[in-house]
Amino acid sequence: VRNAYQGIGTEYETLLRAFDKENAAFAKRVGKDRAKTTYNKYLTVRKYVAEFIKYKYKRSDMSMNELTEEFIRDYCLYLKNVVGLAQSSIWIYSIPLKHIVTTAHYNGKIPRNPFAMYHVDPDHKEREFLTLDELTAMTEINLEDPNMAFARDLFLFGCWTGISFIDIKNLTEDNICIVNGAPWIVSKRQKTGVPFQIKLMDIPIQIIERYKSFRKDCHLFHIGDHGTINKHIKRVAAMCGIKKQVSFHVSRHSWAVLALEYGMPIESVSKILGHTNITTTQIYAKVTSNKLDHDISVFESRIKGHLPVIGGMV
């Protein structure tokens, strides 16, 4: 009787049941068009949601029909106060839940979407990036350890293409296309499936050629696990005197910042990064003071001569 009242009968969709179905379907796509890390995130969120339901409602599951804005707010507070997550992590762990709930709404399983009226703040922080001088230092340093050199070269490839680690790992010879006599990378982001393309400059071309003889299949690079590559990159950065928290993803940030700083329109930056909207790019790419100074100087030079003269003192 209680289950029927709460909508947990076999004919009703429950939240954890919906998670299990989504995760089972997701697992089949891992290694194809979905990343193992994202799958693990969905599993973690499923665990947190189950623990929250037990903590808050003293139950093992709940009907999708019971979900409200209050449920989402309390779940986020649970992640903050009980689990101890930072706001940025809470935002990340709310995304799979939002996907499950929104999909259920679109499929007619629930009459309303509680996420439509509740927004989880991502708490955007300043994105770390390397300056051109820092990139030059990492480029010019001589490395005797071939593993460290390879990690550095992959990092530089990301710095001059804006391509993420997993998408670099997925690149094959088929992703290189010749357009107007120049080589381009044309592919899709594994994370979102959004197409991206970028013309290859000299440094990424040199890196591709450098590791051609090391290929074991059609992939451009034979890359190990993310953690090992990151460890080598941090060591190289430290050897170059770089005090920043450097990880592989900093290469993508660095490309975006340099592209904007040297005048590439944000629409083009967004397209190359594979973003679905410019709002994401504005968060992702930090506009430096040098870029702002340049833009203001250009504005000043263009408007000079058109300004009215301030009248003298009365």
What are these regions (language model features)?
Residues 37, 44-55, 81-115, 166:
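N-terminal DNA-binding recognition helix of tyrosine site-specific recombinases/integrases
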Residues 119, 125-128, 134, 170-207:
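Conserved tyrosine-mediated DNA breakage-rejoining catalytic core shared by Y-recombinases
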Residues 129, 189-193, 226, 273, ...:
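Catalytic-site neighborhood detector that most strongly recognizes the C-terminal catalytic loop/helix
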Residues 124, 190-209, 215-235:
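C-terminal catalytic core of Y-nucleophile DNA break-rejoin enzymes
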Residues 87, 91-93, 110, 114-165:
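Basic, Lys/Arg- and aromatic-enriched nucleic-acid-binding interface segment
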Residues 6, 10-46:
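Short, aromatic/basic-rich helix-turn unit that serves as a nucleic-acid recognition element
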Residues 156, 160, 166-167, 235, ...:
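C-terminal catalytic core of tyrosine-transesterase DNA break-rejoin enzymes
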Residues 299-314:
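C-terminal secondary-structure termini that scaffold catalytic or DNA-interacting sites
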